[in-house]
Swiss-Prot record:
Description of its domains: In contrast to classical members of the E2F transcription factor, atypical members contain 2 DNA-binding domains and regulate transcription in a DP-independent manner. Both DNA-binding domains are required for DNA-binding and are proposed to form an intramolecular structure that is similar to the winged helix structure of the E2F-DP heterodimer.
Main location: nucleus
Subcellular location: Nucleus
Function comment: Atypical E2F transcription factor that participates in various processes such as angiogenesis and polyploidization of specialized cells. Mainly acts as a transcription repressor that binds DNA independently of DP proteins and specifically recognizes the E2 recognition site 5'-TTTC[CG]CGC-3'. Directly represses transcription of classical E2F transcription factors such as E2F1: component of a feedback loop in S phase by repressing the expression of E2F1, thereby preventing p53/TP53-dependent apoptosis.
Protein name as it appears in the record: Transcription factor E2F8
Induction: Induced at the onset of hepatocyte polyploidization.
Length: 860
């Protein structure tokens, strides 16, 4: 039992869940009865009684409580001032009346709308003052006193005073104080308003609105927009789009609030409304037409339907005041769409001549155009008689605001011009090009002019000297010097054209400023060269010979097709003319399909070589060869200095040391192109302080004869070679200049040679009828030195072919080297690659369909 007591006491919230025993003892019931009164929270709470049934809790209950608490203090304060007797009794009486009476009874006890109407209020107001007051008596009006006497709000009195002020029946003295003038100036004012209305062409606007109403039916909003457009067109012509308040002479408004826009709106509208009655032929105006005309005072696009209705209500207020003055009366006009309320003019008949003096109003458009805006505002603001007061016209306020807005826009505008301004300026003015574009265009024009001048002068000199005629006999022992057309070699930068002797080309060379620097390679464009054709009876051949002192190893920097002579000359001249042209065309097509093109020049080896017979030279003399012209060229700097120039004009020495005459022939790989003797291609002696080492690199389709520069500055090389350029740079440069096709890749891997010694081919001493040769490869490299204008040049021995004229192997050589579609007597010229392996290129007509694999054993 004790445990049960503890459970019941400790967990009272579980009593409801506990089941009563089947046979509860009476003692347990007594214990529960004793515990029950002590457990107050366990009992069910009773519902609290409502404090106030008649006053429910509302969101403003606290506010009402505060007002009721503060109101005694307010009443005591009013009692101290002596005003609480009259004013406190009225709210108390109203409160008591409102408490005792219901809503309808309270409304009935208040003054009715008719009693509070503006017309009735205006009648009461006019009854207080005479129509024609005595000017000698004080006729001041205090609006506070009038509102208190008439028991109305002061704003209702303001509406009446504004309409009376528009007719100059009252004038404002100070705040809430006016002067009563009565009807003394009424006739004069009405005459003035009629003249102003005629100037504004209100009669025409009324007729136009009526005619459009008959033509089509539209609602208020659309008609507002259309009629505002008409009003703007008419008022824009007369300059009265925003007419100011029409004043009379002698009537002054000394307060600034008179000219404020907000207070002036009702007065100006009242004057315009009166004008409509005075100018209309049947002096009946409906409020709808009046609203359409008078609504042009404000911005019509900003007005919606509610504002339009507000204008109508304001017109009703004006009409009520004018009706109280017995100037108009309300009538109903019957139209097609029904009866409409309108007002008829019942005032005095006014003619424009009745006005004794001219009113002060906005000037006509002719005078307004002549005078400034400030003078116009001053005329509208001040009267001619009396002392002008310092009041601010609303137009001045607009002017100040516009100036402030402009200043704010200017100060906040970014420094950079706006895009729209740029577009407008670009349309009005011609576009200004960029400075870099101007410089590029100027440089391009100057280069074109400088490159075109040498061509013109070369053609003139060639025409004068008669180079297009058959050539004179060639002297193999005399080297004619190249002419320099312009003596501007001393200029730091310029294009110096090299005028050749009859069988060379004019190559413009750009001279750099620095006396020493990286070597340059001259590239000639292949498409502009003219080919030299031999006579049909002559078929010269070129066979490279092996030099003894100088070798033709390739420099890795000379990877992009360095050459001064061709592989060999073909016997295409024996073919007919169409076949020769076809061979030329095929050779041009197949040259771009190869991998890396290299043309090796063979140096004359000395007296061991076979000399050219005099018959061949004589036959060569009579060849009419037009001079090929290369109008443009490129200079590409190379990182490794070489001594290319002088060795093309060196007198080569053998072991015997006897100099050999400079009988060099620069051939072309195209069939039918005649070789040119090197005696006509001599060196140009450049000043050593102006020219850096040059590498002359000519494409095979344009190579006929190349002059080589010769200078002491070209002979000496750098003690240590510079870093070789990468193959990507070389390929990009050559492809950008258009010298190689995009598919051709030039290798720039370093090679064994430190310098390049071009080797010129020699004329093979053989008869024309028995031209037989066999190209053999010489495997043993020869190391030696050659004197280049007094400077020793070390050369790495390369494998050069040794010309052999076998007596009985003509058929084998012809069958071996014959190519399908090639020439009848093809020639071969091996060239040396960077790795030292020999490769053989056969003739100029390369057919990619057949690949010839030749081993050195077959050739030997």
């Amino acid at each position: 039992m004790e445990n049960q007591k503890e459970n019941l006491f400790s967990e009272p919230h579980k009593r409801g869940l506990m089941k009563s025993p089947l046979h509860p003892s009476s003692k347990a019931n007594m214990v529960l009865a004793e515990i029950q009164p002590d457990l107050g929270p366990l009992t069910t709470p009773t519902k609290p009684k409502e404090v106030s049934q008649g006053e429910p809790w509302t969101p403003t209950a606290n506010l009402k409580m505060l007002i009721s608490a503060v109101s005694p203090e307010i009443r005591s304060r009013d009692q101290k001032r002596g005003l609480s007797d009259n004013r406190s009794a009225l709210p108390e009486a109203r409160d008591c009346l409102h408490e005792h009476l219901s809503g309808d009874e309270f409304e009935k006890s208040q003054p009715s709308r008719k009693e509070k109407s503006l017309g009735l209020l205006c009648h009461k107001f006019l009854a207080r003052y005479p129509k024609y007051p005595n000017p000698a008596v004080n006729n001041d009006i205090c609006l506070d006193e009038v509102a208190e006497e008439l028991n109305v709000e002061r704003r209702r009195i303001y509406d009446i005073v504004n309409v009376l002020e528009s007719l100059h029946m009252v004038s404002r003295l100070a705040k809430n104080r006016y002067t009563w003038h009565g009807r003394h100036n009424l006739t004069k004012t009405l005459g003035t308003l009629k003249s102003v209305g005629e100037e504004n062409k209100y009669a025409e606007q009324i007729m136009m609105i009526k005619r459009k109403e008959y033509e089509q039916e539209f609602d208020f909003i659309k008609s507002c927009g259309i009629e505002d457009h008409v009003i703007k067109s008419h008022t824009g012509q007369n300059g009265h789009s925003d007419m100011c308040f029409v004043e009379l002479p002698g009537v002054e408004f000394r307060a600034a609030s008179v000219n404020s826009r907000k207070d002036k709106s009702l007065r100006v509208m009242s004057q315009k409304f009166v004008m409509l009655f005075l100018v209309s032929t049947p002096q009946i105006v409906s409020l709808e037409i009046a609203a359409k005309i008078l609504i042009g005072e404000d911005h019509v696009e900003d007005l919606d339907k509610s504002k339009y209705k507000t204008k109508i209500r304001r017109l009703y207020d004006i009409a009520n005041v004018l009706s109280s003055l017995d100037l108009i009366k309300k009538v109903h006009v019957t139209e097609e769409r029904g009866r409409k309320p309108a007002f008829k003019w019942t005032g005095p008949e006014i003619s424009p001549n009745n006005s004794g003096s001219s009113p002060i109003m906005p000037l006509p458009a002719s005078l307004e155009a002549e005078q400034s805006a400030k003078e116009n505002c001053a005329k509208n603001l001040f009267s001619t008689r009396g002392k002008p007061s310092f009041t601010r016209h609303p137009s001045l306020i607009k002017l100040v605001k516009s100036i402030e807005n402009d200043r704010r826009k200017i100060s906040s505008a970014p420094s950079s011009p706006v895009k729209s301004n740029k577009a407008e300026s670009s349309q009005n003015s011609p576009p200004v090009p960029n400075k870099m574009a101007q410089l590029a265009a100027i440089c391009k024009m100057q280069l074109e002019e400088q490159s075109s001048e040498p061509r013109k002068k070369v053609k003139v000199n060639l025409a004068r000297s008669g180079h297009y005629k058959p050539l004179a006999p060639l002297d193999p022992t005399v080297n004619t010097e190249l002419e320099l057309l312009t003596p501007s070699l001393i200029q730091p930068l310029g294009v110096v054209p090299l005028i050749p002797s009859p069988l060379s080309s004019a190559v413009p060379v750009i001279l750099p400023q620095a006396p020493s620097g990286p070597s340059y390679a001259i590239y000639l464009q292949p498409a502009q060269a003219q080919m030299l054709t031999p006579p049909p009876g002559l078929s010269p051949t070129v066979c490279p010979t092996q030099p003894s002192n100088a070798t033709g190893s390739k420099d890795p920097t000379d990877a992009p097709a360095e050459k001064t002579a061709t592989d060999a000359a073909t016997t295409g001249s024996l073919q007919p003319a169409p076949e020769r042209h076809g061979a030329k065309h095929r050779s041009k097509e197949t040259t771009g399909d190869r991998g890396t093109k290299r043309m090796i020049t063979a140096e004359d080896s000395g007296p061991s070589s076979v000399k050219k017979p005099k018959e061949d030279l004589k036959a060569l003399e009579n060849v009419p060869t037009p001079t090929p012209l290369f109008p443009s060229g490129y200079l590409i700097p190379l990182t490794q200095c070489s001594s290319l120039g002088p060795d093309s004009v060196l007198s080569n020495t053998e072991n015997s040391g006897t100099p050999s005459p400079n009988h060099r022939i620069y051939g072309s790989p195209i069939a039918g192109v005649i070789p040119v003797a090197s005696s006509e291609l001599t060196a140009v002696n450049f000043p050593p302080f102006h020219v850096t080492p040059l590498k002359l690199m000519v494409s095979p389709t344009s190579m006929a004869a190349v002059p080589v520069g010769n200078s002491p500055a070209l002979n000496s090389g750098h003690p240590a070679p510079a870093q070789n350029p990468s193959s990507a740079i070389v390929n990009f440069t050559l492809q950008h200049l258009g010298l190689i096709s995009p598919g051709v890749q030039m290798s720039a891997s370093p090679g064994p040679g430190a310098g390049t010694v071009p080797v010129s081919p020699r004329v093979e001493a053989d008869n024309l009828s028995s031209r037989q040769r066999r190209a053999t490869n010489h495997d043993s490299p020869v190391l030696g030195q050659s004197q280049l204008n007094g400077q020793p040049v070390a050369g790495t021995g390369a494998q050069q072919p040794v010309p052999v004229t076998p007596k009985g192997s003509q058929l084998v050589a012809e069958n071996f080297f014959r190519t399908p579609g090639g020439p009848t007597k093809p020639t071969s010229s091996p060239y040396t690659d960077f790795d030292g392996a020999n490769k053989t290129s056969f003739g100029t007509l390369f057919v990619p369909q057949r690949k010839l694999e030749v081993s050195t054993e077959d050739i030997h």
